[in-house]
């Protein structure tokens, strides 16, 4: 009996749903432990959030004086609170018994965009709410975030376009292309890793669930009505 239960547990763990749940968990853990430090560096050193700009005389080019690390705890709590909610929603979809596996993977692919949207909005907010003693005429968003934003937007467009493809194999190829773009985005701007890791985990879960879909064009079921003879 124990052997049968162990065999069934191993089979469930290696199933597409088991791999999807594992991908979601690994993505969130990587975001917390690998991405939080890079996120703090981006917010503090590049975006100068909660920093003040001071000049000691007319010849001084000026420098930033930022808050200590404890002052940024709120940033982490807010960021990972949102990511945690996204994770719970994704886990619920992955564990749900939906009739259409293709729709299930599409939903996860759509949810994978949410961490990127959160990252984009929060970095915009961090650079838009500037105190009056910041360097005049400076834009702290363009240099650290414009290149990575272009890559992230491209990846999101690929996800949306792939979701419209009826063939599961081609749809999976689109999701994998988006995953490669997200990896490139994290290399361009390591501060985006906190969002990219959650997105990659969710998108990998969508790819895992695609393996349950037959490789054929998905068409709606049409019931033909015949008149009785």
Task: Tell where the protein language model's regions lie, with residue ranges.
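Generic alpha-helical transmembrane segments
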Residues: 81-89, 116-124, 147-159
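N-terminal topogenic module of multi-pass integral membrane proteins
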Residues: 1-103
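Cytoplasmic membrane-interface segments at the C-terminal ends of transmembrane helices
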Residues: 10-20, 88-110, 155-179, 183, ...
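Short, intrinsically disordered terminal tails adjacent to the first/last structured region
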Residues: 1-8, 220-229
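Juxtamembrane/interfacial segments around transmembrane helices
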Residues: 73-86, 131-136, 157-163, 198-210
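Membrane interfacial helix motifs at helix-loop boundaries and amphipathic/re-entrant anchors
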Residues: 38-79, 120-149, 185-199
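Membrane-interfacial catalytic/cofactor-binding modules of polytopic membrane enzymes
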Residues: 106-110, 134-161
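Transmembrane alpha-helical segments of multi-pass membrane proteins
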Residues: 28-29, 101-124, 175-189, 227-229
